[in-house]
Amino acid sequence: MRRLFFCFMAMMGVLTLSAQSVYENEVINNIMTRTSIRQYTNEPVSKADIETMLRAGMAAPTAVNKQPWHFIAVTNKEKLAELAGRRGMIKQAGVAIVVCGNLDKAMQGKAQEYWIQDCSAATENILLAAKALGLGAVWTGCYPMDDRVTEVFKVLKLPETIVPLCVIAIGHPAEQPTPKNKWKPENVSYNEFGGKAE
């Protein structure tokens, strides 16, 4: 009996080890194992989780701390269907977060385009927050594709100074794709283009 007990405990140890994170650091592991999820269950996304993701988005860095963004959380099923167009995953999502640039809050002149970087950083934060909450998400682009931007403008009744960068479809995952290993040393240089590590 004792032998059976120890065998069972050893098996549990192996299972625990195999289920451990690839990286010990939780944040790094979250980044490395995040992947696009395009299929969702019918379970709704809670208001608390939506707010957490929005807070994560607003925690992103911005040029001169302008925070030139506006977020629209869409949970209404009819609106989601309108917003989806050819992107079916949005229709079945529990929520879609539309990340927009607010040109009234953006820097002026050539620097105005920094809103794109700022809102992209916010988008990645939302994707990582979704992963941390056990949700699945996928980033679908709008700007600078005129047809997509116009479509979102119309559905969400946006004023001219609010420009949709992307629509993030989010829900409880109905698929578990294996994260891709995107590490490619040939895409890295040190000290100058083509430079090798010392």
Where are the regions a protein language model picked out?
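Positively charged n-region of N-terminal signal peptides that target proteins for export
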Residues: 1-4
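Hydrophobic h-region of N-terminal signal peptides that target proteins for export
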Residues: 10-18
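Acidic, surface-exposed loops and disordered segments
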Residues: 6, 18-198
